[in-house]
Amino acid sequence: MLKYISPMEKGMNAASYFSLNFYEPVNKLLTKYNAGKVFLEGDAIIVSLLEREGDAMLAVSRACVLAWEILSLVRGYNELLERSGLPQMELGLGIAYQDSAPLYLMDGDHRIMISDAINESDRLSSCNKRVRKKLAPDAGLFRVYRLQISANADSDGGSSSDDITMNYNVGGICLSEPAFEKLRQEISLAPWKVNFKSTAAEKKWLDDQGELLVGTVPLANGAFRKIAIRKSRVAQVDVRDFSLLHWTDRRYYEVCADPALYAALPGEKSAAESQK
C-alpha cells in the first residue's frame, strides 16, 4: 500500500501532479519487479506481488526492495519539486502478507481482488495526525513508530482488547508480523550492532531492546540488494500528552529507508551506494 499524504498546492491540477510525479515513475518500477497494480484509491496505490508455482518464493523480500526503490525515487523527485517551489510528496508504505491465494470478484471482464492483506497494508501505511505532530521533530533516522494507549492507566505492559495503537509513518515502510516471519523464511537475517549519533529526544523513542537485522535479497539477473529491518516494541503512552510511559510486549517492524543508515553497512556495497 503506497499512500501519498502531502497537501496539494492551490491551483494545481491534482491528477496531473500525481501522474507526473508519482504514478508514472512507480509504474516503471512495478514492471521491473513483476508487480501488479491492484487498483488506485484516491491518493493511494495498492500493489501486489504474487508467488506462483515454479517461481522463487521471494515475494516479501522483493516487496521490501521495491518499497525502498519507490522511496528513493520520490526523494529524487522531491529535490526537483523543492527547487521549483512546489509541494513535496510524502509517502507511507505498508507491506502485508497473506499465506493463501487471493479471491476475485468479476465485474464484467475486470477482476477485483479480495484479500485481507489489502486492509492490513492500508493500516500499516497510515499516519496518525497527533502522533505525527508529537514524533516528527524527533524521528531521527527511522520513519516508522507505533504507539499504544489504553483505558487502563495501571497497565503493566501487557495488551488488552481496549488498547488502541496508532502509527507514525512518514517516508517509511512498515512490515506486518506475518510479512516479517515470511521474510525470515526467504532470506537470512543477521543482527547488526551499530551506534548512530542521536539526540536525547530521538533516543527516547528508540527501544533499548530493539534490534537491527540485515539481509541480502536476490533479484533478477544475478543482482543482489541489502535491506535492514528494525524490530521494536510498541511504546505505551499517556493519552493526554503522548508522553512515554513504558514499553509493551507488542512488536512492530520497519524496513529501514534512510540512505545514511545503508551507507553505514559494513563490507559489501550498500543499497544507498548502488543507487548512485
Where are these regions (language model features)?
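Intrinsically disordered, glycine/charged-rich C-terminal tails and inter-domain linkers
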Residues: 129-276
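Short secondary-structure boundary/capping segments
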Residues: 11, 108-112, 190
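Catalytic NTP-binding/metal-coordinating core of nucleotidyl cyclase/transferase enzymes
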Residues: 1-65
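Acidic, metal/cofactor-coordinating or nucleic-acid-engaging core segments within structured domains
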Residues: 16, 24-28, 62-83, 129-161
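Catalytic core of nucleotidyl cyclases, primarily class III adenylyl/guanylyl cyclases
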Residues: 32-59, 78-115
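Alpha-helical scaffolding flanking metal-ion-dependent phosphate/phosphodiester catalytic sites
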Residues: 95-97, 117-130
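Short regulatory "switch" loops immediately downstream of catalytic or recognition motifs
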Residues: 3-6, 48-52, 75-76, 125-136
